[in-house]
Amino acid sequence: MLNDPIITDRTIFARNCVVRKIPCNEADKFLADNHIYGSASCRYCYGLFVKRATGAAEKKSAPDSRHENAAIEGWTPRGQYDSLITGEPVAVACFSNARRWEKNGRSVCSYEWVRYASLKDSRVVGGMGKLLAAFIEDHHPDDVMTYAISTVAPGRQVRTGYGIGKSEADNADFGNAFRKLGFVEESRMTFPSRLVEGEMSVSIKFRLKLTY
């Protein structure tokens, strides 16, 4: 998920943040800087923005290079070692357009959760759940599906699946962040890594059923 998930300089609490819809081009910029696979084609994008910062965990400093990564309107860097600034984007979630089919005599409206990323130097506690809840409230899906992907890159563990591990055994349950949100595993597959030649990735398909 993140470009450098091992380094988490601070913890950010989603309860101190606010969700806003954002244009896809703004989400693309954030994802290019903070998601290992970059941006993707999406229909609906949401950002999580700092409303207030409290607690020692949120006061750790980050280098100014991080400030170059967030060009979303309403956020202005104030200094090289400011940690959290009101209006700063700390996470982004992107979803597909609706896909519809018939199931048991009724129309089912399904969406894919395509991307989620938080700032690469941070861990956003409750961020995934808060962004997902906002999307569900706006669009009332019958279900939401997504994929968690885990692999290993040179010198670091890549966390595209919202979990992390150094070996195949460590990665057995790498999709736990989805499970905690109510998603159920439907299938998993192994395939050659897109990031590292000779390495294998594991992909788990998850689905959150909301109305059936």
Regions found by a protein language model. Name each.
Residues V158-G165:
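Short, conserved, GDST-rich strand-edge loop motifs in beta-rich repeat architectures
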Residues T8-P154, S167-A169, G175-N176, K180, ...:
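A conserved beta-strand-loop-helix scaffold within acyl/acetyltransferase catalytic domains
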Residues M1-D9:
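Short, structured interface segments
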